[in-house]
């Protein structure tokens, strides 16, 4: 069975079993809602156990979650550094033009026939996502996921076609 990262437990929060999670999912409200089931993996990416979310709230850049039946810091402290994953079968169907992060990261980016680089990360600074493109011999390129820039996404071909608008590439 395939699993996909949705977050990493970075610390505990208070004494009542809450944990700070650095989310790497574009569906945090869905993934961390009360009753949702996730799978814990340790630092060596080994399965630990399935857990059920008892509560979730946002605080600054973190998602604060609590697992069902784990209501004390001593119970959950050992999970610091562990990953939270969702089973592939639990992924939601997406609308046309929507993609999961794991589908986008690693795609090659082209402007015309020229390889620009590879998408290494997705940022969520505000109104739209920003794709971080790793380039050879140059600084990373930040591409907003908006229609004038991203022309086509072809998941099966692992290719993204873009038009780098004036001002986006400060090295040209």
Curated annotation (Swiss-Prot):
It holds the Pfam family RimM. It comes from the Bacteria. Its main location: cytoplasm. It is found in: Cytoplasm. HAMAP family: Ribosome_mat_RimM (MF_00014). Belongs to the RimM family. This is Ribosome maturation factor RimM. It comes from Streptococcus pneumoniae serotype 4 (strain ATCC BAA-334 / TIGR4).
């Amino acid at each position: 069975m395939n699993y996909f990262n949705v977050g990493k437990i970075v610390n505990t929060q208070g004494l009542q079993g809450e944990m700070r999670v650095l989310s790497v999912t574009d569906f945090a409200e869905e993934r961390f809602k009360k009753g949702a089931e996730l799978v814990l993996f340790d630092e060596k990416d080994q399965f630990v156990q399935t857990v059920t979310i008892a509560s979730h709230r946002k605080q600054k850049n973190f998602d604060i979650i609590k697992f069902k039946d784990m209501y004390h810091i001593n119970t959950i402290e050992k999970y610091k550094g562990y990953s939270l994953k969702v089973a592939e079968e639990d992924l939601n169907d997406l609308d046309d033009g929507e993609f999961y992060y794991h589908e986008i990261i690693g795609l090659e980016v082209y402007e015309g026939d020229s390889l620009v680089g590879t998408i290494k990360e997705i940022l969520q600074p505000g109104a739209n996502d920003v794709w971080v493109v790793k380039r050879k011999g140059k600084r990373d390129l930040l591409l907003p996921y908006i229609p004038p820039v991203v022309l086509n996404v072809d998941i099966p071909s692992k290719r993204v076609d873009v038009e780098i608008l004036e001002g986006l590439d400060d090295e040209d």
